């Protein structure tokens, strides 16, 4: 679709989404909201994409924050889902726990994994490791009956395929992992 405006990477996401109504991101979300398309992706402003996902398309009831995820191959030939990879650089523990639910549902529906193993990316496998955010997320996730929580994983387990099928982290850590591995590939 041809548009005459662009939401630049340096634009304030919410203001740009409201003001640049003939940008591809706003037009795309408009089509999505009207049911003219089934999905929408953009290589443009991540912030504007988040604004669009929260304003133009009604989020699933109960979802606190949307996420960006990526599916990566594992050394065992399987797949691993990593989320968040850049949308929310700071996440409350409740959001990380919710990503466990979202990731588990996605892994079942889209990757065909029957009982996906969900883990928190952390600096150690032990329950007591990590910052306050990771420890609090761990506590919430281990109590959840909505997914198969297997604990913490370290970066060395990201692509092993042996520990987890879904790995949850904040967008700062996830984006760092994503960019590091894409550069290494």
Name what the model sees in each region.
Residues 42-64, 133, 179:
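Short Gly/Thr/Asp-enriched flexible loops that form oxyanion-binding sites at enzyme active sites
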Residues 52-84, 144-153:
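Short, acidic/small-residue loops that bind anionic groups at enzyme active sites
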Residues 93-155:
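Glycine-rich phosphate/diphosphate-binding loop of Rossmann-like nucleotide-binding domains
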Residues 73-105:
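Short, glycine-/small-residue-rich phosphate/pyrophosphate-handling segment
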Residues 180-185:
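Conserved small/polar residues in nucleotide/adenosyl-binding loops
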Residues 1-37:
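Phosphate/nucleotide-donor binding subsite
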Residues 138-178:
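Oxyanion-binding "anion nests"
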């Amino acid at each position: 679709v041809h548009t005459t405006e662009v939401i630049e990477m340096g634009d304030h996401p919410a203001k740009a989404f409201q003001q640049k109504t003939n940008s591809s991101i706003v037009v795309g979300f408009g089509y999505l909201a009207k049911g003219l398309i089934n999905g929408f992706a953009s290589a443009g402003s991540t912030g504007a994409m988040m604004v669009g996902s929260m304003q133009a398309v009604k989020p699933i009831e109960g979802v606190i924050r949307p996420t960006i995820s990526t599916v990566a191959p594992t050394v065992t030939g399987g797949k691993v889902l990593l989320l968040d990879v850049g949308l929310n650089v700071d996440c409350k523990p409740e959001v990380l726990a919710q990503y466990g639910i979202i990731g588990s549902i996605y892994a079942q529906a889209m990757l065909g994994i029957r009982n996906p193993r969900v883990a928190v990316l952390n600096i150690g496998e032990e329950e007591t490791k990590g910052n306050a955010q990771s420890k609090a997320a761990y506590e919430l996730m281990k109590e959840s009956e909505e997914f198969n929580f297997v604990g913490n994983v370290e970066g060395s387990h990201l692509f092993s395929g042996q520990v987890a099928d879904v790995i949850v982290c904040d967008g700062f850590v996830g984006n760092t992992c994503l960019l590091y591995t894409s550069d290494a590939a």
